[in-house]
């Protein structure tokens, strides 16, 4: 099935053409990072207006790069939620319009569900598998037993890992988004140079908390300002990044032990982080498990990842109704209700 996938949950307008839920014919992403950098974070109203401006050009570009027309599309997959309501509505409206005009089915997909299956665009993963999804808004551990069959094992109790990266970067005076900048500076620093907390590291549970680490960064910068560029700033970035990675790895290792699964997916925007990729590779090597981390282009928000579960649901006859609305909050444990 040739699926047009559309993603507009936050600040990327994306469209992709994927054949059979596996072969990417095109994947176009229009980022708003430069626009929101002026405000130090995503402004929902501005994001929605930019999506309205870019949705048609992005879809047209995806079709052109794939060498197909609207008449070739057999189904549409679109992010229904979670995300910014106004932003989601732009993508959903476009998907409904195309599906209605062409007389083809469409399906609303959970944004995180897309991240879970991003590795399938490179090589399928056998069920069951453990998934760690780390991004600006999510830090969750899931047991994935099949399409639509997800069990949340752990989640952030406050800030997500990506949010902690961006807020800590802002505290240091680094430009938005700061996660990539911290990663780059960390490679020039010493991860053991500055002592920082590892929240909930030894609590015995699988939940995460990064607000305390963020506060520790604020206190450190307040008492000991650093010059950028500079060796001390690099050390602080390296120490912060190592603290985050230590927590993520420890919780993931505990989840692997509890579930007994031998396959691990690490996905989401923070999965681009070089320190996290190295740490997870070391964990996988030590435990002899099958680790899948998508290529960086598939870690950040994109539309192609939505086509994997979208294609499955459409082929199973689980299309969405035109009356379906966006949902800004959506529990992953309930995604499979009414379909599988």
Curated annotation (Swiss-Prot):
It comes from the Bacteria. Keywords: Acyltransferase, Cytoplasm, Iron, Metal-binding, Transferase, tRNA processing. Coiled coil: none annotated. Substrate binds at residues 133-137, 166, 179, 183, 273. It is an enzyme of class 2 (transferase). It catalyses: L-threonylcarbamoyladenylate + adenosine(37) in tRNA = N(6)-L-threonylcarbamoyladenosine(37) in tRNA + AMP + H(+). Binds 1 Fe(2+) ion per subunit. Its EC number is 2.3.1.234. GO terms for cellular component: cytoplasm. Its main location: cytoplasm. It holds the Pfam family TsaD. The keyword Cytoplasm applies. Its cofactor is Fe(2+). GO terms for molecular function: iron ion binding; N(6)-L-threonylcarbamoyladenine synthase activity. The keyword Electron transport does not apply. One of its GO terms (biological process) is tRNA threonylcarbamoyladenosine modification. It is found in: Cytoplasm. Fe cation binds at residues 111, 115, 301. Belongs to the KAE1 / TsaD family. Required for the formation of a threonylcarbamoyl group on adenosine at position 37 (t(6)A37) in tRNAs that read codons beginning with adenine. Is involved in the transfer of the threonylcarbamoyl moiety of threonylcarbamoyl-AMP (TC-AMP) to the N6 group of A37, together with TsaE and TsaB. TsaD likely plays a direct catalytic role in this reaction. This is tRNA N6-adenosine threonylcarbamoyltransferase. It comes from Pelobacter propionicus (strain DSM 2379 / NBRC 103807 / OttBd1). The gene is tsaD.
């Amino acid at each position: 099935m040739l699926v047009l996938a559309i993603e507009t949950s936050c600040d990327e307008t994306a469209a992709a053409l994927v054949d059979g839920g596996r072969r990417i014919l095109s994947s176009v992403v229009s980022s708003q990072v430069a626009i929101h950098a002026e405000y130090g974070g995503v402004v929902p109203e501005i994001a929605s207006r930019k999506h309205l401006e870019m949705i048609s050009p992005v879809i047209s570009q995806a079709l052109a790069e794939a060498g197909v027309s609207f008449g070739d599309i057999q189904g549409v997959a679109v992010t229904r939620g979670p995300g910014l309501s106004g932003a989601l509505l732009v993508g959903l409206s476009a998907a409904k319009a195309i599906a209605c005009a062409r007389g083809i089915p469409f399906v609303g997909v959970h944004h995180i569900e897309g991240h879970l299956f991003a590795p399938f665009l490179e090589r399928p993963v056998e069920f069951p598998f453990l998934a760690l999804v780390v991004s600006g808004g999510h830090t969750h551990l899931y047991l994935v037993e099949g399409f639509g069959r997800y069990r949340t094992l752990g989640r952030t109790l406050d800030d997500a890992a990506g949010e902690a990266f961006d807020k800590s970067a802002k505290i240091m005076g680094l430009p938005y988004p700061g996660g990539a900048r911290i990663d780059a500076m960390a490679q020039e620093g010493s991860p053991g140079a500055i002592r920082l907390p590892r929240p909930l590291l030894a609590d015995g549970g699988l939940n995460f908390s990064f607000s305390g680490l963020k506060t520790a960064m604020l206190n450190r910068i307040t008492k000991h300002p650093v010059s950028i560029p500079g060796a001390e700033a690099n050390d602080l970035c390296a120490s912060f990044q190592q603290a985050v990675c230590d927590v993520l790895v420890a919780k993931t290792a505990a989840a692997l032990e509890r579930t007994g699964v031998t396959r691990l997916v690490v996905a989401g925007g923070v999965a681009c982080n070089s320190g996290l990729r190295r740490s997870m590779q070391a964990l996988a090597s030590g435990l002899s498990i099958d680790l899948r981390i998508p290529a960086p282009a598939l870690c950040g928000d994109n539309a192609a990842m939505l086509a994997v579960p979208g294609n499955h649901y459409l082929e199973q006859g689980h299309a969405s109704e035109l009356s379906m609305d966006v949902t800004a909050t959506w529990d992953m444990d309930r995604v499979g209700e009414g379909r599988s």
